[in-house]
């Protein structure tokens, strides 16, 4: 179908007209007629003489008919007629009256036929005009703007699926840019065939199932991401707990050191720690005094134990690390008073001997402890 879009608005412009085209239907008063004659005289100063103004009397009426370029006047008195004829002969070919001037003169009532020209710059078709095609009776609407024309029509579609087939119409919009009129557009008469996806895209009537699927997918994504975040946080907390626990165990291990384990193996369950004095020189002096005092006391006791063991049986030699119970029992077995002087002399000799032999025993024990 061929659609021709043209303008429905026309511009009526003022046109110049001659006296032969003026049709008067009423007569004016005397003063109005005089003013009109004065207006005509100003248009054709070179053609109308001053005798026309002086010779006209108060009884002159407005011209009532116009034909073939000459103007006739009605005279009710005996005024000279030659002046009127002179006026008509000089005006017939030179006077033109603009329609704008006639609109200002209230003495005339004219029925003119305006000149009609089509507009070529702006399409002014009514905003919502519905036209009916004469060929296929298709309905379309035309909307206009400043530079465009919008045509809306119905397009037939045929949708086919496995179980159903149906036809329907959807509105289509075509935009035509304004150019030299007339604008031409052909509405397609063929039927467009498609499946349900096309129907869903055009109207959205069959997208309910797809919308639910999309919502289910979104819900699944949200739930999965939440569960994943929770599991990740739990794993991170567990790993951090293990790392902190291992560090604490390492710190506790380093405080006790290697000697703590050796002391545990030789039945020294407790490790005493003493605070170091603030003055390092006092620490050195205390260490020397403690070492000398303990060495003298140990040498005295060891010599006495060795002497008593040799005097009792001569087979077992008591040692501070071995046989302490036998040493204590043997020590209280000697109670006679006459042996005290002898024992004192023997103790002096044995103390010197034990002082010589003790360092070797301590070195041996320390070596065994390090091996253990």
From Swiss-Prot:
It comes from the Eukaryota. The modification Phosphoserine is found at residue 329. Its main location: membrane. It is found in: Vacuole membrane. Keywords: Membrane, Phosphoprotein, Transmembrane, Transmembrane helix, Vacuole. The chain crosses the membrane at residues 224-244. GO terms for cellular component: fungal-type vacuole; vacuolar membrane. It is a single-pass membrane protein. Present with 3360 molecules/cell in log phase SD medium. This is Uncharacterized protein YDL211C.
